[in-house]
A protein has these predicted regions:
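Short beta-strand-loop/turn "lid" adjacent to the catalytic site in phosphate-handling enzymes
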Residues: 50-88
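Short glycine-rich, Thr/Ser-proximal phosphate-binding strand/loop in the N-terminal lobe
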Residues: 2-45
């Protein structure tokens, strides 16, 4: 599955794309102090609750908040084993 991350000034939205539809979406407040590990613990808990094992094979990050991009990149590489495409 593709992990799509849309980071705006107010909220960051995470979504799982299965190739045909969004299998799940989650939203959290954007905070530049949040670490990659915090993102992962939160996201994995929601994935587990929804029955979505963390089988992410790719990721894309769209962001208007440059200070957050580094930790989102680390989230993708460290916890999902993929190098994200960053746009925006």
């Amino acid at each position: 599955m593709l992990l799509a991350i849309d980071c705006g000034n107010t909220n960051t939205v995470f979504a799982l794309w299965d190739g045909a539809r969004f299998a799940a979406t989650w939203r959290m407040a954007t905070d530049h102090r949040r670490t990659a590990d915090e993102y992962f613990v939160w996201l994995k808990a929601l994935m587990d609750l929804g029955g979505h094992a963390p089988r992410v094979t790719g990721a894309v990050i769209s962001s208007t908040v440059p200070r957050v991009v580094f930790n989102l990149r680390v989230l993708c590489s460290r916890h999902f084993g993929c190098r994200p495409l960053v746009v925006g």
